[in-house]
């Protein structure tokens, strides 16, 4: 296999250095970013009989997968995962699906070479007929951007590049990085893959995500060498006292329910308010997350997506947005009418419009009014 250094003239990609374990040495990060990646495709598994990983040691890898990815790995009637198990003579399984949980764990145990090979097969399954996903659970979102067209000119080859999210303990992450990032640089160069480790722990655990991107066979060879590093550094068996990550519903309480609203682009500014103050207050009051699409639709609308812990919160935010929109429309209509009549909008009409948007039919005395500028309609939040 030729190294990425031999093919650096064919690629402009730089390796990510988002690994906080080497952040205390800025020079090592800068060095890491100088390596180039050509995503060399490897057709054969590297079977090194002299490697320590083939001396009777077993290893277990945990992979974070989405519900959709888990379904692909299992396959119809469980045929896909059974084939991987049979061909590699390993233990492989997926954690039970938890209610209101968006992720599952793929667990693979056995001799390191077979485990690495099976994970290469898993990646090949995931890249077949791949469709991008939008993930609410932030740890499911890939840290590495997709390979660029400059890196892989052949569209069919480009489709074969995929990502795996290995779940590793902090000592395991340190083992992969090595002194001054030397080991992770070598892994990247040798196997022409991309590697990045998350800066933060997974919820309720001391585990982090180690993401690997590349061709399935290249990723398999990289994982095999990672297994060897774990065994050499004696970090392949995590301490029993270490909190390990597992999917459970409380992890996904952050955001579960979503609704979209189409807002005419000419009203977006009024709904956001000066400096985004109005939408910020609405988010805080309803305990929701509101994301505004950047590009208008064919109808000239901007899409507001509301995320929340429950349907009630999302519905409240949706109702308040729509009422704010109605008030703004009415305010503009009255303003236009006043210009035609040569008179100003009566203050009583504006006050009446303000009280009409109190959520859940609350009394006016129970309302919290946000500051209103000359160009904004009033917004009322009920307690």
UniProtKB/Swiss-Prot annotation:
Single annotated GO MF: RNA binding
Sequence ranges assigned to domain KH in this UniProt record: 58-122, 161-226, 256-321
Gene symbol of the encoding locus: HEK2
Keywords for the protein's UniProt record, in alphabetical order: Chromatin regulator, Chromosome, Cytoplasm, mRNA transport, Nucleus, Repeat, RNA-binding, Telomere, Translation regulation, Transport
Compositionally biased intervals (Polar residues): 363-376
Native source organism of the sequence: Kluyveromyces lactis (strain ATCC 8585 / CBS 2359 / DSM 70799 / NBRC 1267 / NRRL Y-1140 / WM37) (Yeast)
Purpose of the protein: RNA-binding protein involved in the correct localization of transcripts in the cell. RNA localization is a widespread mechanism for achieving localized protein synthesis. Involved in structural and functional organization of telomeric chromatin and regulates silencing at the HMR locus.
Name of this protein: Heterogeneous nuclear rnp K-like protein 2
PROSITE patterns membership: KH_TYPE_1 (PS50084)
GO biological process, one term: mRNA transport
Residue ranges of the region described as Disordered: 332-383
Homology family: Belongs to the HEK2 family.
Superkingdom of the organism of origin: Eukaryota
CDD domains: KH-I
SMART domains per the UniProt record, alphabetical: KH
Quaternary structure (record): Binds RNA.
Localization: Cytoplasm; Cytoplasm, P-body; Nucleus; Chromosome, Telomere
GO CC annotations on file: chromosome, telomeric region; nucleus; P-body
Principal location class: cytoplasm
Bilayer-spanning residue ranges: none
Composition-biased stretches (Low complexity): 343-362
InterPro entries found in the cross-reference section: KH_dom, KH_dom_type_1, KH_dom_type_1_sf
Lineage: Eukaryota, Fungi, Dikarya, Ascomycota, Saccharomycotina
């Amino acid at each position: 296999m030729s190294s990425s250094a031999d093919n650096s003239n064919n690629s402009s990609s730089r390796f990510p250095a988002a690994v906080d374990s080497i952040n205390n040495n800025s020079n090592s990060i800068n060095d890491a970013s100088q390596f180039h990646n050509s995503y060399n495709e490897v057709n054969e598994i590297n079977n090194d009989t002299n490697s320590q990983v083939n001396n009777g040691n077993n290893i277990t890898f945990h992979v974070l997968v989405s519900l959709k990815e888990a379904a692909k790995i299992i396959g119809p009637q469980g045929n896909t995962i059974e084939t991987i198990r049979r061909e590699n003579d390993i233990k492989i399984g997926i954690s039970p699906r938890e209610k209101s949980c968006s992720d599952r764990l793929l667990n693979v145990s056995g001799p390191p070479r077979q485990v690495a090979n099976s994970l290469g097969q898993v990646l090949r399954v995931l890249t077949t007929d791949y469709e991008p996903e939008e993930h609410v659970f932030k740890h499911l979102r890939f840290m590495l951007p997709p390979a660029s067209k400059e890196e892989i000119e052949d569209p069919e080859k480009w489709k074969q590049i995929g990502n795996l999210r290995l779940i590793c303990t902090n000592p395991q992450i340190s083992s992969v990085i090595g002194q001054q990032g030397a080991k992770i640089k070598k892994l990247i160069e040798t196997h022409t893959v991309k590697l990045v480790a998350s800066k933060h722990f997974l919820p309720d655990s001391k585990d982090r995500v180690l993401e690997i991107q590349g061709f399935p066979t290249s990723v398999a060879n990289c994982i095999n060498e990672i297994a060897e590093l774990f065994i050499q550094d004696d970090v392949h068996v995590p301490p029993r006292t270490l909190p390990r990550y597992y999917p459970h519903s409380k992890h996904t309480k952050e955001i579960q329910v979503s609704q979209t609203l189409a807002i005419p682009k000419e009203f977006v500014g009024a709904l956001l308010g000066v400096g985004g103050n109005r939408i910020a207050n609405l988010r805080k009051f309803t305990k929701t997350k509101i994301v505004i699409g950047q590009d208008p639709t064919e109808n000239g609308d901007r899409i507001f997506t509301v995320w929340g812990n429950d349907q009630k919160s999302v519905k409240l935010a949706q109702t308040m947005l729509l009422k704010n929109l109605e008030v703004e429309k009415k305010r503009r209509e009255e303003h236009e009418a006043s210009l035609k009549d040569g008179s100003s909008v009566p203050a009583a009409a504006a006050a009446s419009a303000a009280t009409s948007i109190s959520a859940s039919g609350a009394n006016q005395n129970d309302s919290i009014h946000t500051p209103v500028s000359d160009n904004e309609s009033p917004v009322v939040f009920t307690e």
